[in-house]
Amino acid sequence: MVRDGYFYGLALLVVAVIVHLLTGGWSWAVLPLLLAAFFLWFFRDPKRAIPGGEGLVVSPADGKVTEVARIRTPQGELQRISIFLSVFDVHVNRSPVAGTIASVAYQKGLYLNAMDPASAKKNEQNTVVVRADAGYEITFKQIAGLLARRIVFTKRVGDRVERGQRVGLIKFGSRTDILMPPGFEILVRQGQRVSGGSTILARAAEGAGVLAAAPTAPGTLASTERPI
């Protein structure tokens, strides 16, 4: 379980006990007890089987694939997979590839519904570029939603990460985008459910030249993405 779950859960359990002592019964303590149970469940962090193999990109989050598209950016043409996380999904984020954190760019913004296409540009977000061991770069974005008001990223530039390793959290419903060069074969489709760290999203195609189209300026992606 994520540490936040213990904090919220224990705090509400204390509230429930205080209410019980003040009222002499448990009827008024039911609500904080239910909320405590919800937070303990919401911040769950199940173990995942991380797939092995070369050139694989795994999902950085649990949720539903809402878009698979090609977009134009100042860095060239990229492929984007968007994943919507409802309040019922696990909200732990995981690294899509093994490598080194090349850059982290935080952008203040709005809190539009994560299903709104405009949320990719206007919402609060954190853009992370991971330079894979094979040399290419994969970008993923933690995007806040209508209820998600806090983005957590636990790594720093230069840190080593493994494929499927826990790297952050988005609280209470959100969206995660992953951007990759054209030289990757997409293995998921719109509407498919994915699991963070275990579902394979894409595979690098041999001889596809994935290095040339790798994004290098994550701070500009949010405002300049254009669908093809």
From Swiss-Prot:
Enzyme Commission (EC) number: 4.1.1.65
UniProt entry tagged with the keyword Repressor: no
Membrane topology term: Peripheral membrane protein
Active site: S174 (schiff-base intermediate with substrate)
Cleavage (non-hydrolytic), annotated site positions: G173, S174
Chain positions found as Pyruvic acid (Ser): S174
Manner of cofactor binding, per the entry note: Binds 1 pyruvoyl group covalently per subunit.
GO molecular function, one term: phosphatidylserine decarboxylase activity
Post-translational modification (record): Is synthesized initially as an inactive proenzyme. Formation of the active enzyme involves a self-maturation process in which the active site pyruvoyl group is generated from an internal serine residue via an autocatalytic post-translational modification. Two non-identical subunits are generated from the proenzyme in this reaction, and the pyruvate is formed at the N-terminus of the alpha chain, which is derived from the carboxyl end of the proenzyme.
Record keyword Membrane present: yes
Subcellular location, record wording: Cell membrane
Known catalytic reactions: a 1,2-diacyl-sn-glycero-3-phospho-L-serine + H(+) = a 1,2-diacyl-sn-glycero-3-phosphoethanolamine + CO2
Highest taxon, organism lineage: Bacteria
Cofactor(s) of this protein: pyruvate
GO process annotations (BP): phosphatidylethanolamine biosynthetic process
UniProt entry keywords in alphabetical sequence: Cell membrane, Decarboxylase, Lipid biosynthesis, Lipid metabolism, Lyase, Membrane, Phospholipid biosynthesis, Phospholipid metabolism, Pyruvate, Zymogen
Pathway assignment: Phospholipid metabolism; phosphatidylethanolamine biosynthesis; phosphatidylethanolamine from CDP-diacylglycerol: step 2/2
GO CC, any one term: plasma membrane
Protein family membership: Belongs to the phosphatidylserine decarboxylase family. PSD-A subfamily.
Function: Catalyzes the formation of phosphatidylethanolamine (PtdEtn) from phosphatidylserine (PtdSer).
Subunit structure: Heterodimer of a large membrane-associated beta subunit and a small pyruvoyl-containing alpha subunit.
Name recorded for this polypeptide: Phosphatidylserine decarboxylase proenzyme
Native organism: Acidobacterium capsulatum (strain ATCC 51196 / DSM 11244 / BCRC 80197 / JCM 7670 / NBRC 15755 / NCIMB 13165 / 161)
Taxonomic path: Bacteria, Pseudomonadati, Acidobacteriota, Terriglobia, Terriglobales
